[in-house]
UniProtKB/Swiss-Prot annotation:
Species assigned in the record: Oryza sativa subsp. japonica (Rice)
Active site: 952 (proton acceptor)
Signal sequence region: 1-20
Main location (coarse class): membrane
Motif extent (Cys pair 2): 701-708
Subcellular location: Cell membrane
Residue stretches spanning the membrane: 741-761
Protein name from the UniProt record: Brassinosteroid LRR receptor kinase BRL2
A Pfam family that the UniProt record links to this protein: LRR_8
UniProt remark on domains: Contains two pairs of conservatively spaced Cys (Cys pair 1 and 2) possibly involved in forming some heterodimers.
Recorded family membership: Belongs to the protein kinase superfamily. Ser/Thr protein kinase family.
UniProt: brassinolide binding residues: 580
Amino acid sequence: MDILIPLLLSSIYVSSSAAAAETDAAALLRFKAFVHKDPRGVLSSWVDPGPCRWRGVTCNGDGRVTELDLAAGGLAGRAELAALSGLDTLCRLNLSGNGELHVDAGDLVKLPRALLQLDLSDGGLAGRLPDGFLACYPNLTDVSLARNNLTGELPGMLLASNIRSFDVSGNNMSGDISGVSLPATLAVLDLSGNRFTGAIPPSLSGCAGLTTLNLSYNGLAGAIPEGIGAIAGLEVLDVSWNHLTGAIPPGLGRNACASLRVLRVSSNNISGSIPESLSSCHALRLLDVANNNVSGGIPAAVLGNLTAVESLLLSNNFISGSLPDTIAHCKNLRVADLSSNKISGALPAELCSPGAALEELRLPDNLVAGTIPPGLSNCSRLRVIDFSINYLRGPIPPELGRLRALEKLVMWFNGLDGRIPADLGQCRNLRTLILNNNFIGGDIPVELFNCTGLEWVSLTSNQITGTIRPEFGRLSRLAVLQLANNSLAGEIPRELGNCSSLMWLDLNSNRLTGEIPRRLGRQLGSTPLSGILSGNTLAFVRNVGNSCKGVGGLLEFAGIRPERLLQVPTLKSCDFTRLYSGAAVSGWTRYQTLEYLDLSYNSLDGEIPEELGDMVVLQVLDLARNNLTGEIPASLGRLRNLGVFDVSRNRLQGGIPDSFSNLSFLVQIDISDNNLSGEIPQRGQLSTLPASQYAGNPGLCGMPLEPCGDRLPTATMSGLAAAASTDPPPRRAVATWANGVILAVLVSAGLACAAAIWAVAARARRREVRSAMMLSSLQDGTRTATTWKLGKAEKEALSINVATFQRQLRKLTFTQLIEATNGFSTASLIGSGGFGEVFKATLKDGSCVAIKKLIHLSYQGDREFMAEMETLGKIKHKNLVPLLGYCKIGEERLLVYEFMSHGSLEDTLHGDGGRSASPAMSWEQRKKVARGAARGLCFLHYNCIPHIIHRDMKSSNVLLDGDMEARVADFGMARLISALDTHLSVSTLAGTPGYVPPEYYQSFRCTVKGDVYSFGVVLLELLTGRRPTDKDDFGDTNLVGWVKMKVGDGAGKEVLDPELVVEGADADEMARFMDMALQCVDDFPSKRPNMLQVVAMLRELDAPPPATAI
């Protein structure tokens, strides 16, 4: 009997264990049922009844499931967490890295209560975190929900928990975290990459075991709490990219400093100086204080004691004084970036000691003087040297040739002289050599071409002599070659055609002769451009007018404040605008042909090669001030991306090819001072450009010059000359005949004048009566849509002319505007917005214009209004609604615009009911509208002087002309209103709900990246057919949040407008279109593309895939 009882109990135990294992297997199979895709066969073994042998499953000694790890399995479908609730022994759950495995955040409360560790990072988790979900799991210590699409707030979630590690980085969570209470057990807290606001929680000082604190990329404000310095074991402190103020707490250099390895406070508004107490941080490897307002000198003691530091990032501050010699003590220092400060004095002679680890030395945009120390060659690992915009003088030390690892040597705008050292040819890894704007002379050493990996060579504005060496043809990776403004002579070597990666060629202002090589436009594109120019920050400084030669220049702009350009003497004399900055142009890696070609200010002769028309992405072509002959090739009309075309001051003949009408991106053309003839093509943009750009061609006619019909034909002129040369009749007969004619003419003229005077007087009386009636109705307000403010003095001004920018409206008066709108009646009202009401006016000749009546403001005066009008009136582009004129009378301000017959995109897309209007816009039409609106906004950002931030980009400000071409409207309005009214809050000028970027709610500081966000919302409207705000559709969120949530859930197709046919190539285009739109509406401005990049992406949307070699 004693033996039977244990056997019976054992049998019962085995039976219950087996039953429990079967329950675990059933739970896992229920979970598997919701997984629709398993491309890697992760769950293929989940078939036999024993779950402990299944992949990703770990069991205890009793055969119960304790761990489920399906990380990076490529699973797709839905993670049904409720199915796992029966796994009551499950301690660890890892579903990370399954981006298409969607998890409802609300299900986080349905997991087994025994859970210790939870990792759902990099997955499809979306929604709000349930209140108190951590309290459901008393043993839970480690939670990682990073890089998902979580929303909602954090406060209260960490209460009553034993959490040791909590990571919700890279989500869309928000709310004020100032008052959140944190558990004393906390060791790792990562809230980075969200939208949290408020101050850094003071409760952090109670987390004595905290080792990692990452609050970067949020909207936190206030000072860094002094109490953080009391956390003895803190290893990582990252509060970068917030709005923090105050100084770096000196307390960080006390208790916390003993273990601190990473200190990041960059991209805030931190002030004060670098505390000397940081000299105690012997373990510090990364010190990042960049992009703040830190001032004072670099404490010598700090650099002398940070022997473990590897990265010293102090750029973009106001740090002054000289660079301490003690930097040589930082034996482990790999990256030293002190860009954009006020560091002065000479570089320490012992900056580099033998065996130093230094790889990057960046000191651009400072006040460093003296010579370059030859001892830099001791830093044998140096890859990057950047000393741009300083006061260095003397020659480049030939000892730099010993730096065999050197990849970038950038020293533009200094006072360097001497020659380019031939020893640099030993730097076989050299990719970038930028020495422009110095006093370097001599020829280009042939040894330099041993550096066959060169990608960017810029020697512009020096005193280089000799010829352009044919050895440049060896450089198959050469993408940028700038040799402008030197004394180079001879011919352009045809071997440049072998530079199969060449994108940017600027040889302007030299003494070059001969013809333009035909191979230049024909031999490009045979080498893939992968990796070329990667890591470079580019800026194109474009010259305006003729104060400086050439179109402009491409600069390496990393670590340089844009305003510093204004202080560069050689640039200060130029009228310039910074046209483009950012990463390498995306089109380069796709098409592999020249984008920029400037050969102006030379002595080139011969004809313009037809082959230049094969450069499909060419944006700038400047051949001005040469001795070119022949005709402008019609093939250049194939350059659909061409923005600048200048062939002025040559000897060209013939006409302007009609193919130029297709150049929709053209914003500047100058063909003046040639021998061209014929009519200027009236299609496209050529007729809208200034007449001065066609001057000096006596044979040219048509808008914007005199109409061709106004010129007498040659035969007529010959006939008049012949008549003038015939013999006169006898004198007496002529006198008798003339007397009779004169008498008749005088009598007729007198009668005609009397009749005309009577008619004019009668017409004036009728007009006066009509004007008085109109004025009365305007002031009564009974027939009008608005309230008018006209004093008695303005009654006499109803005949005032409208100041116009178009010839056909030269004689338009205010009275005619009243008549054309029936007294600005409600029937003529076609729209209203934040800046005023818009009326349709039908003029006497049947043409229509749109009239915007600005809101009444406390105007500062007429000068500001007229100055803004003159600026806006000169802005002309195919994709902008042109301002035709303006009228000022009393307190009224009227703007006259070209009328857009198809109304706004908002009306066309949404109609009156909030859904797509009928007939629905096709996908091709939507793409066309997106491209046009992008070009218009891009023009405002980069081509207008001064640049214009729209501030209210939305679908109602995208108008459609008769050809359904998009025109951006209301540009410049926010700036005009703010210039006229001193009492208008900036917040009222910052956009329309649904289009306003999140950063505007924090600072109200409008930027071009804010416009990009608003444009991204317009793209989402085109894609979804939905308005940006609709409580029925989106509840408490908006279109942007709704689309992000759907895409995060893997349901991106559900957001597409039902009116669109999604199939074939269109489906792929829509996916790319959505990806581009989501880039535009990224919460972080720095992650959004600029409009130049958006235009390029839209252009590539329709581009055929690049041809492959056979």
